[in-house]
Amino acid sequence: MQLSQLFHYPVKSCAGFSLTQASAQLSGLEGDRCWMVADSSGKFITGRQWPRMVLIRPGITPTGLRLEAPDMEPIEVSYQDYLQPQASTVWSYEFQAWRGPTEVDDWLSFFLGTDCRLLYIGQQSQRLLRSDASKPLTFADGYQYLLIGERSLQDL
C-alpha cells in the first residue's frame, strides 16, 4: 500500500492540514484528534452541529496548540495548563479528559456562538478501543486510522 496524502486533525471537527510525514502510534497519528471542543457537560460537539468549527485552523506548537479563525486574534494554549479533570463523552463512550484555561473556552464560545470548552486527551488516554481494550483511542469517533482509496474519493 502506498499513501498518496496524509492529513492531520489536531482538534476533532476543526480544519486539518496536509503532512509529508508523521509518527504512527497505537492511538493514531501523533497528536491527531488529541483536542476536542465540548459543551459544558463535556459532550463532544462537531462541525455537523456547528459548521463554523471547520473554519478553526489548529496548529501544533512545541508547547501546545495554536488556534486561528476568521476575524479572531490567534490564541495559544499549553499542554501544561490542562490539569483539571473533566468527564467527557464521545458518542456513548464516557472517559476522563482534561480542561485548561477559560480564555480559550471563551475564545471558542465567542467564535461558535455557543458555550463550549476545549478539552485535551492528555499524555495517557483513558479512552480505549472497544474491540481491543489494549489499544488507546484519542477523540476520534472510533478508529485510530481512517483510509480511503483514490477511486472511492473520485466517486464522491
How should each PLM-predicted stretch be described?
Residues 1-156:
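Small-residue-enriched flexible connectors and coil-helix boundary/helix-cap motifs
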